[in-house]
């Protein structure tokens, strides 16, 4: 599962 989202000007990517 891949997820990416934008939070407080920072991009988080969870694999």
Swiss-Prot record:
This protein's UniProt keywords: Glycosidase, Hydrolase
Catalytic reaction(s) noted: Hydrolysis of terminal, non-reducing (1->4)-linked alpha-D-glucose residues with release of alpha-D-glucose
Enzyme Commission designation: 3.2.1.20
Class of the enzyme per the UniProt entry, highest EC level: hydrolase
Single GO MF annotation: alpha-1,4-glucosidase activity
Family affiliation: Belongs to the glycosyl hydrolase 13 family.
Protein name as annotated: Maltase
The organism of origin for this protein: Bacillus thermoamyloliquefaciens
